[in-house]
Amino acid sequence: MTTQPAFIIDVRSPLEFAAGHLKGAINIPPDRIEQAIGAIDGLERTSPILLYCLSGARSAFACQVLAQRGFTQAKNGGAMATLLLNFERA
């Protein structure tokens, strides 16, 4: 198992998230990332953040948004299926 980053963000839709997600992940769809990111307790601009979705496209967009907002440790984890090789499913 890989050591989990401090924050795991699933940027899929709430329906996709409800169907299954990585253990410890929170759900913030890409169209809400700018508004919701500031409401996460303990999150700082230097906090490690792993974002993922179904294919990696939405998480790439969300990573770009966070980088533009000064989050220096936001990483695109890509596709959920790939991450399941190293992380637990909730």
Question: Residue spans of the language-model regions?
Answer:
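Rhodanese-like catalytic fold shared by cysteine-dependent sulfurtransferases
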Residues: 2-7, 11-48, 57-90
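Short, surface-exposed ligand- or partner-binding patches at beta-edge/loop junctions that are enriched
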Residues: 52
